[in-house]
A protein has these predicted regions:
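Structural recognition of the beta-strand scaffold that forms the well-ordered cores
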Residues: 24-29, 33-34, 60-65, 115-121, ...
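Catalytic His-Asp segment of secreted/periplasmic serine-dependent ester chemistry enzymes
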Residues: 81-87, 161-250
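Surface-exposed acidic, glycine-flexible loop patches that form ligand/cofactor-binding
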Residues: 14-19, 52, 100-114, 144-150, ...
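Extracytoplasmic, non-cytosolic globular domains
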Residues: 44-48, 131-182, 226-230
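Generic low-complexity segments that are intrinsically disordered, proline-rich and/or Lys/Arg-biased
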Residues: 4, 115, 152, 188, ...
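Short, well-ordered coil/turn elements that cap or connect secondary structure elements
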Residues: 20, 55-57, 150, 180-185
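N-terminal secretory targeting modules
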Residues: 1-67, 234-251
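Conserved SGNH/GDSL esterase-like catalytic core that processes O-acyl groups on lipids
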Residues: 35-133, 137, 164-168, 172
Length: 251
């Protein structure tokens, strides 16, 4: 275990001694979240992230109405004898508005609402006539729906995995959403997945199978990004009875 994970694991262990709770994590998105093609290891970021969190000592429960990938035959292997928690809310090919339109139904069926929601949406909206209608308004609605179930939910909004012109034009909109929707008790933060991202397939350092879907390298990069974004909230969430989450006073 690297020093950063070791330090985090020690903090998590201390929280457990004081009385811990399970942190509910909702992976919400499109194919980047669902994955699961059987012809390639399309495990998504969820797979390495889950084991990173467990290795760091956190009691996490991935939630969602889905467990399968795009193809039912796709599998996620155990790691060091530990099974992967495959629950998620990823839907291959869906737009932001389509996810928004089904979210209330999904949330009503979860045993408990998420403490942290990881959102990866917008890739299927890049050809939309209006990003305001296709991305901004649905994402704001999604944040509002999540808060109806948990006023303290932490929302981590992933940037599109691309560096093309259309993806770049969407970036300031996501930053605007975060600024306008974050509150002292319910943070909304962006995750800059596009940094150090190489989408051209076939290169030794490529992060995708096909320009869009992360390969093993890309999946690990996304997991690293999400883990770093989650860290300011994990200890507080795990040791809190009500799941109140906000940044440390020093930040």
């Amino acid at each position: 275990m690297d020093p950063a994970l070791a330090e985090t694991a020690a903090g998590a262990a201390m929280a457990k001694q004081e009385g811990s709770r399970t942190i509910r994590v909702l992976p919400l998105g499109d194919s980047i979240t669902q994955g699961g093609r059987s012809d390639r290891p399309e495990y998504t970021y969820r797979y390495p992230l889950y084991f990173m969190l467990k290795d760091a000592g956190y009691d996490v429960d991935f939630i969602g109405s889905q467990r399968a990938g795009l193809e039912e035959s796709a599998t996620w292997p155990d790691q060091n004898g530990m099974a992967f928690d495959a629950d998620h809310e990823g839907h291959y090919g869906w737009t932001t508005a389509e996810v928004r339109d089904h979210l209330q139904e999904w949330l009503s069926k979860y045993p408990a609402p998420p403490d942290i929601t990881l959102i990866d949406l917008g890739s299927n909206d890049q050809e939309a006539d209006s990003y305001q209608t296709a991305i901004v308004e649905p994402l704001k609605d999604i944040v509002a729906m999540l808060r109806e179930k948990n006023p303290n939910v932490v929302v981590l909004l992933g940037h599109i995995l691309a560096n093309g012109r259309k993806a770049r034009s969407i970036r300031p909109l996501l930053e605007q959403i975060a600024r306008e929707t974050r509150t002292p008790i319910s943070p909304v933060e962006t995750v800059l997945h596009y940094k150090n991202w190489h989408e051209r397939p076939g290169l030794p350092y490529s992060d995708t199978f096909d320009w869009a879907h992360p390969n093993l390298s890309g999946q690990r990069k996304m997991a690293d990004n999400y883990f770093a974004a989650m860290r300011p909230y994990l200890d507080r969430l795990q040791s809190s009875e009500v799941g109140v989450a906000h940044r440390a006073q020093s930040e």
